[in-house]
Amino acid sequence: MIKFSNISKEYHVGTQFVKALNQVNFEIEPHQLTVILGPSGSGKSTLLNILGGMGRPTKGDISFNDQQVNKLNDHDLTSYRRKVVGFVFQFYNLIPSLTALENVAIAAQLNNNDDLSENYLKSVGLEERMNNFPNQLSGGEMQRVSIARALAKKPKLLLCDEPTGALDSTTSMKILGILQNIANTTDTAVVMVTHNPEFERYGNRIIRLKDGEIESINDNEQPLLVGETG
């Protein structure tokens, strides 16, 4: 379980302090898709950076299974990112000279699971595209490769920053379905930052941010599954 306790984050801009997050509290459970919504500038990306160990809060505590992440030294924080967290971004960051399989294999080898690379691509529906290079793939296919690459780390926490932001609505729903399936069938907690309010129907927990503060937290007892109508 991930727990945010009174998290605040300030940035020094010129002679002033800008508060990106203010007294934020929430919990993230495994087997859940958590959707974080909010307008631009609401603090979504800052929150995701702190969750992923890429930034430290100014105040407050973040814990993972009772381990105080914000109190880790730099070496241990790097280990936390490598062993616990997988990242999926809006832009795919694939290595253009490598095939889909090779892009995933790099991450798998770093985590001693290189023999499972094909399985990760199969899990996102790319068994027929493993030997294609990124320039031979559509945007949605490249995003699926990036998800498979993140899964190759066997993360306990999968952080997705606007993963459908560059995709059309049909492809976006396919990506959402993959993320929902990961949350439902593995021990991984999936957190997705998005500006798309339509996605809140599909999350187990919906966190709304506004001006760096929690506006609301709502749980869906029966979230809509991708492919269903409601």
Question: Predicted regions: what is each one?
Answer:
Residues 205, 213-230:
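Conserved beta-strand-loop-alpha-helix hinge in the C-terminal portion
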Residues 2-208:
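ABC family nucleotide-binding domain
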